[in-house]
Amino acid sequence: TQHIYSAYLGYLVRLNKFGIKAGVRAEGTSLKASFARKPDLNFSTDYFDVVPNATLTYQMDMSSQIRLGYNMRIQRPGIWFLNPYINDVNPQNISQGNPNLDSEKSNNVNLNFSKFTQKFSINASLSYTFVNNAIERYTTTADFPSTDPRSQYNGALWNTYDNIGKKQQVGIFLYGNWSPTTWFRI
């Protein structure tokens, strides 16, 4: 079973041509997994994430605006990533989930310019997204202490997940629209 609880607080203020919008979401997740045939694999995981966002807007004139924004998104690991069951169908290539995974946190900063008139509109933006704790699958050679029940798999390939990934993405977006007449748009 999975239960998600959240609360959001936001604030908006306008000062002449400037607008500032800031918010924060607190999110708690409680996950409990039970296995009827293997109760020793039962586990529970709790997450608590604080997810901020902020936007600064400058209204250049009635039809033009510049906006700078930041937001965070979270991606909770799915049950397959968390499941501690050892899949040993192929005894030389073992898979096991990791119930200790954290939520993946994606941070995005974007700068946007937009202009709208009756004849045309243009929207240009530059964005940068980074993740410092991405959930990634990795493979190693099993090498457990002899006291660990998993030591029977020593020497086999061991596949599992951890928050070890780092991702970066840059995006440039340009949208335009031109309406030379009321019935024709490009």
Q: PLM ranges: what are they?
A:
Residues 7-13, 54-58, 101, 111-115, ...:
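Residues on the lipid-exposed face of transmembrane beta-strands in outer-membrane beta-barrel proteins
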Residues 2-4, 47-50, 72, 94, ...:
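Active-site-proximal structural scaffolding
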Residues 1, 102, 117, 121-185:
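Outer membrane beta-barrel strand-and-loop segments of large Gram-negative receptors
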Residues 22-28, 66-72, 115, 124-130, ...:
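Transmembrane beta-barrel strands of outer-membrane/channel proteins
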Residues 13-17, 72, 115-119:
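A generic beta-sheet turn/junction motif
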Residues 3-40, 47-53, 57, 62-108, 128-155, 159, 178, ...:
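Surface-exposed extracellular loop regions of Gram-negative outer-membrane beta-barrel proteins
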